[in-house]
Regions:
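GST-like domain detector, emphasizing the conserved glutathione-binding G-site
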Residues: 1-58, 159-174
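Surface-exposed helix-capping loop/turn segments at secondary-structure junctions
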Residues: 3, 73-85, 126-131
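Active-site rim elements
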Residues: 6, 54-61, 80, 103-109
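Residue-level signal for nonpolar/aromatic packing positions in well-ordered secondary structure
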Residues: 17, 71, 90, 122-125
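Amphipathic alpha-helical packing segments from all-alpha helical-bundle domains
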Residues: 55-74
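Extended, well-ordered alpha-helical scaffold segments
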Residues: 59-63, 110-124
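GST superfamily/GST-like fold recognition
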Residues: 81-106, 111, 121-122
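Acidic/histidine-enriched, glycine/proline-rich intrinsically disordered or flexible terminal extensions
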Residues: 135-174
Length: 174
């Protein structure tokens, strides 16, 4: 484990951290990635397809508020979910809001103040801030040029890539 540890030492907190990470991975991934980001950004820019506007509207009106209501009940007033250092739960949850921010989504801080503060503190942490600089620098770089751009920035990259010039669909139905 890194120091400080990403999993709380208390067994009940550790179980809760695992649950929150799983909630982020499954429910938030479905809502924020597949039903929202994919429709607005990926389908048009990668596949040349029109996104499902009805799905986006329904997600914004119904599904995202349900997720945020749940998170508001879990969110700490200050610090992070399990104290003063980041946990796997903080990272897993905040990552989806970084992604959603790329398509101009922001948490309504008046409606979900604790969640807005919590994710804001997490995204401002050194780990996220370092990645954000790299992400922001390559966000608008054509895919074919991203590897060289990352290398020029000193980002850690693999010795070789298996990328191709054309995107390939995965096995999940989108």
């Amino acid at each position: 484990q890194p120091d400080p540890a990403l999993f709380p030492s208390d067994i009940a907190d550790r179980a809760r951290a695992r649950w929150l990470e799983e909630f982020a991975d499954t429910r938030m991934g479905d809502v924020f990635i597949w039903r929202f980001f994919n429709q607005i950004a990926i389908r048009p820019s990668v596949w040349g397809e029109k996104g499902d506007r009805e799905m986006v509207d329904r997600t914004l009106k119904e599904e995202i508020p349900t997720v945020l209501d749940y998170l508001e009940a879990e969110a700490p007033t200050d610090g992070f979910r399990f104290g003063n250092s980041l946990s796997v739960a903080d990272v897993a949850i905040a990552a989806f809001f970084r992604n959603a921010g790329w398509v101009r989504f922001q948490i309504d801080a008046a409606r979900w103040p604790k969640t807005a503060g919590w994710t804001g503190r997490t995204l401002a942490s050194p780990a996220f801030a370092t990645l954000a600089k790299i992400e922001d620098a390559v966000l608008r770089v054509p895919i074919a040029e991203q590897r060289n751009a990352l290398k020029a920035m000193g980002a850690p990259i693999s010795a070789e890539t298996y990328a191709t010039s054309a995107p390939r669909r995965g096995i999940m139905p989108l």
